Amino acid sequence: MMQESVLAQLDVSRETSEKLSHFVALVEKWNKAVNLIGRSTVDSIWTRHVLDSAQLRTHLTSQPRLWLDLGSGSGFPGIVVAIMAADESPESRFVLVESDQRKATFLRTACRELKLSAAVLAARIESLPPQKADVISARALAALPDLCALAAPHLAPNGICLFPKGVGHISEIAAARQSWNMEMETLPSLTDPDAVILKLKALAHV
């Protein structure tokens, strides 16, 4: 029921629904050998991970040329938003950055099986040349001050960052503002009343 409810809420095509279901099956299969998601969250994967990732697309003001997902790990949100973009903006490209080789292998397998317009970089974020991304996402990767430092070199001039954050977001924002100037919107999360999505732009070090 959870799967049907989430797919109905997302209001996506049959092909996108099938790809999301295929991806969830891949995560569940690989999770037995590679720690992709917490075992306690497997039963709630459709809300805790799929919907939580998919909601990021609702905060776009235009379709991105390049979406950069940092610390992609299990493919949430990177793979999910790439699946949804296949219908909505097939011209968009996705770059998923993951330094863990086993997780990068999983991501490549998922991209290949799902025929996604996505590249996987098995590298540390700090080692990458500037990507000039229109959208940068990162989920459960680092505290906001560190995320700003990781994202800033790769953000296009009019690009945005979308960072899902939990209950501690207020203190993270205060810490980030000590070192970074930014325009910020704090948006409600569809999956957790205590969580938010931070939408940042015009990132500049103080």
Swiss-Prot record:
GO cellular component terms listed in the entry, alphabetical order: cytosol
InterPro entries, A to Z: rRNA_ssu_MeTfrase_G, SAM-dependent_MTases_sf
Top EC class for this record: transferase
Cytoplasm keyword on record: yes
Catalytic reactions on record: guanosine(527) in 16S rRNA + S-adenosyl-L-methionine = N(7)-methylguanosine(527) in 16S rRNA + S-adenosyl-L-homocysteine
Protein localization: Cytoplasm
Family to which this protein belongs: Belongs to the methyltransferase superfamily. RNA methyltransferase RsmG family.
NCBIfam families linked: rsmG_gidB
Protein name (Swiss-Prot/TrEMBL): Ribosomal RNA small subunit methyltransferase G
Species per Swiss-Prot/TrEMBL record: Cereibacter sphaeroides (strain ATCC 17029 / ATH 2.4.9) (Rhodobacter sphaeroides)
